[in-house]
Swiss-Prot record:
It comes from the Bacteria. The keyword DNA-binding applies. Belongs to the bacterial histone-like protein family. This is Histone-like DNA-binding protein. GO terms for cellular component: cytosol. Signal peptide: none annotated. Disulfide bonds: none annotated.
Amino acid sequence: MTITKEKIAAMLSSKLGFSNNLCEEIVHTVFSNILEIAKEQKLTLKNFGSFEVKQKNPRPGINFHTKAPVIIESKKNLRFVPSSKLKALINGSTR
């Protein structure tokens, strides 16, 4: 299931009674701050999980069309590790 920030804001608005515009601004601000923090360092959201940017080193590879060796450049990957409470919630156990 894919959910948009607008849908999250609409759910907040109906649940809390705030205006939809205010809730959209809150959701946008929260996600923007999470992204900014996660770019710089490991970010852990208690009872949810951790986001961390990992640097992948360059490595040798093969061009599938020409079979020639190539170097795959380094890149950054975002890694998410769910918390044990989130895993338990998904798997149906209550802890």
